[in-house]
């Protein structure tokens, strides 16, 4: 036994499932995976915005549109080559049912063969006699039917006539035999129609479909940033930035211009300049120059 043969799984179904997963991963290019992840992030951000700003109609419409797009991806996996959980589960159940049916048929055949091989000669004789009796009864019935007169032979039970509604619709008679056999349901391809218009119809094999009306990027509101951390807020002095200001709308203070101050500004300028000049050479401001 080689080491490669030992590593192989004993169950053939497990190996088949692994091969199918690898094929799905190789078939989907990198761009498709990126676009699917982008749609997922857009849906998450829109759901957060809906929680924060529930009264905004624009955000609600975008959230509904994103949900439709996501459900359409799950409902049409074959067209977009996406393996959804529901379809894989259905396929698994179908495969298991088929396998169980095959196993049941094989077991019945084996049991019948065993009975034939290990059966008693008396039972065999009884079976042969029973089959001969049944064939004789059938032949008697055929001869009795042939001996009946022609008039009685041709008399058949009258077929109940259809009502007026059925007579008006000739297609009803053609539909009746179809219901007896197995019904086949044909699912029409689901076409997404957004309020912005039809989706971009692109080649699925080469390009990925992006849905119209959805934003590619969503800017969530930024959290409030404090000027200092909680440990240093009371130790160090206050900073010039307002603590409760957010990044989106910083705080600003409007300055009111006083009329009296502007008028008296020129008159007081001369007195202030003289006082400053005298103070530089005096003893009052001597501490500054020491």
Swiss-Prot record:
Keyword match NADP: no
GO cellular component, as recorded: chromosome; cytoplasm; nucleolus; nucleus
Single GO BP term: negative regulation of cell growth
Ranges of Basic and acidic residues composition bias in the record: 16-26, 114-130, 138-167
Compartments, as annotated in UniProt: Cytoplasm; Nucleus
Protein's job: May play a significant role in p53/TP53-mediating signaling pathway.
Protein name: TP53-target gene 5 protein
């Amino acid at each position: 036994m080689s080491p490669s043969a030992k590593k192989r799984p004993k169950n053939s179904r497990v190996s088949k499932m692994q091969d199918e997963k690898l094929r799905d991963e190789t078939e989907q290019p990198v761009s498709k995976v990126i676009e699917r992840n982008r749609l997922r992030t857009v849906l998450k951000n829109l759901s957060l915005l809906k929680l924060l700003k529930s009264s905004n109609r624009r955000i609600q419409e975008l959230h509904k549109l994103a949900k439709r797009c996501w459900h359409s991806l799950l409902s049409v996996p074959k067209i977009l080559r996406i393996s959804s959980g529901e379809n894989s589960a259905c396929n698994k159940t179908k495969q298991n049912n088929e396998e169980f049916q095959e196993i049941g048929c094989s077991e019945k055949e084996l049991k019948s063969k065993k009975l034939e091989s290990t059966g008693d000669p008396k039972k065999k004789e009884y079976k042969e006699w029973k089959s001969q009796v049944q064939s004789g009864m059938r032949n008697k019935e055929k001869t009795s039917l042939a001996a009946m007169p022609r008039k009685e032979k041709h008399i058949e039970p009258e077929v109940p006539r259809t009502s007026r509604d059925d007579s008006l619709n000739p297609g009803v008679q053609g539909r009746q035999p179809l219901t007896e056999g197995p019904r086949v349901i044909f699912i029409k391809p689901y076409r997404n129609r957004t309020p912005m218009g039809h989706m971009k119809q692109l080649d699925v094999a080469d390009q990925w479909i992006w849905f119209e009306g959805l934003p590619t990027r969503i800017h969530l509101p930024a959290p409030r940033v404090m000027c200092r951390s909680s440990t240093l807020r009371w130790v160090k002095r206050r900073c010039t930035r307002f603590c409760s200001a957010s990044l989106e709308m910083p705080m600003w203070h409007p300055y009111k211009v006083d009329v009296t101050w502007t008028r008296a500004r020129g008159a007081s300028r001369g007195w202030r300049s003289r006082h400053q000049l005298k103070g530089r050479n005096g003893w009052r401001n001597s501490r500054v120059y020491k």
